[in-house]
Amino acid sequence: MSAIIEIEHLRKSFGENEVLKDINMNVNKGEVVTIIGSSGSGKSTLLRCINLLEKPTDGKIIYNGKNVLERGYSLPKYRTHLGMVFQSFNLFNNMNVLENCTSGQMTVLKRNKEEAKKIALENLEKVGMARFIDSKPAQLSGGQKQRVAIARALSMDPDVLLFDEPTSALDPEMVGEVLKTMKNLAHTGLTMVIVTHEMEFARDVSDRVI
């Protein structure tokens, strides 16, 4: 298996507080890697560094053989290859479900409306949310919102999908539906990096647990 992402000697500090210290890890294409650890250990910061929502203090992030932190590398282009599912869904409240899943495709990937709609519907079907296309986020449960967020990320055709504790903001009865959705995506060719406290889930789906 070839590495799609290689992290070498990564460090991240906030002022005097060094959150990530000399992190080294590889993620192979199609692999499901789960990162576990105690609260405050820097798991979410690592994901945010991988997609450059946070700029690392030092080290390398190598994507398909090229260091994305080198001057001249196109960060917007790099970010189009990474999807991220956040704890707090981050849906657009003024848009319905379908619009949430098409707006990024049309704006960033320059797809036309019909193509974007077709791809969005395919992914909403995958996560069991196709019948809610006209609903606004306020009309959905937390679990439903997170499944829409997953469909939205998938609709951007990412090479790597990052999950930052996707069930931590959910009521216990809604956790299962999101984990089931993620389990169905695992080992379909999509590369997944997951931060979670769900240990049983991590054991079931992961190729590696870090």
Language-model regions, residue ranges each:
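ABC family nucleotide-binding domain
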Residues: A3-I210
